[in-house]
C-alpha cells in the first residue's frame, strides 16, 4: 500500500476503505508503519515513532477486528522496531539493527516467514524475531554483493538458515 509515509501511486481512498474491511477479518496482519497509518487514518509520524504512538495505531487496527498485528519496520534510531500486539492488549517488540537501505519485497518475505512459522506452532514473537533477523541478513548479504536495491534482496543462498528452524 505504501512506504516511507506515502501511499503508492495507485492506492486510492476507495482502495484503503476496502482494505480496512479486508484486514478486519485477518487473524494476523503485518503492515509496515505507512500501511498501518493508512489503515487507521493516522498521520505518518515525521520522527521516530514512539511506543505510545505505536500503541494507539495498533489499538485502532484491533478496533477494526484484527486479532494479531505486527507493525513492521518502525524506525528507531539505528534500529527497526517491529511492534507486536494482539486484541487482548498484549504487546511485544523485536528490534534489529538497520542493515542497509530499504529493498522492495522484504515485507513479502517477512510475512511468508511469519506465516510458515505460525503454522509450525512458533509464537508470534519467535516468528517476528526469525523473520526480522532473516531480512537483516538478506540486506547485509545483498549489500556485500553491491546488489541494486531496486532488484530486491538476494535471499535464495540464505534459505538454508530457515530450514533448520
Regions flagged by a language model, labelled:
Residues 40, 118-119, 139:
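Hydrophobic residues in alpha-helical segments
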Residues 125-165:
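Charged C-terminal helix
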Residues 1, 35, 73-77, 97-100, ...:
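Glycine-rich beta-alpha junction loops
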Residues 2-6:
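Transmembrane helix exit motif
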Residues 90-92, 117-131:
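Phosphate-handling active-site elements
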Residues 100-124:
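Short, small-residue alpha-helix embedded
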Residues 7-91:
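Conserved phosphate/ATP/ADP-binding segment of small-molecule kinases
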Amino acid at each position: 500500500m505504501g512506504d516511507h509515509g506515502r501511499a503508492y501511486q495507485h492506492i486510492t481512498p476507495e482502495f484503503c476503505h476496502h482494505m480496512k474491511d479486508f484486514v478486519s477479518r485477518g487473524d494476523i496482519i503485518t503492515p509496515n508503519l505507512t500501511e498501518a497509518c493508512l489503515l487507521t487514518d493516522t498521520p505518518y509520524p515525521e520522527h521516530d515513532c514512539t511506543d505510545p504512538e505505536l500503541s494507539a495505531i495498533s489499538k485502532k487496527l484491533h478496533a477494526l477486528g484484527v486479532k494479531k498485528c505486527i507493525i513492521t519496520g518502525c524506525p528507531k534510531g539505528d534500529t527497526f522496531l517491529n511492534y507486536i500486539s494482539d486484541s487482548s492488549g498484549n504487546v511485544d517488540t523485536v528490534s534489529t539493527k538497520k542493515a542497509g537501505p530499504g529493498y522492495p519485497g522484504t515485507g513479502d518475505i517477512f510475512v511468508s516467514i511469519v506465516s510458515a512459522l505460525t503454522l509450525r506452532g512458533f509464537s508470534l514473537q519467535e516468528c517476528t524475531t526469525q523473520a526480522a533477523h532473516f531480512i537483516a541478513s538478506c540486506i547485509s548479504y545483498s549489500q556485500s554483493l553491491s546488489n541494486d536495491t531496486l532488484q530486491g534482496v538476494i535471499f535464495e543462498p540464505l534459505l538454508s538458515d530457515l530450514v533448520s528452524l
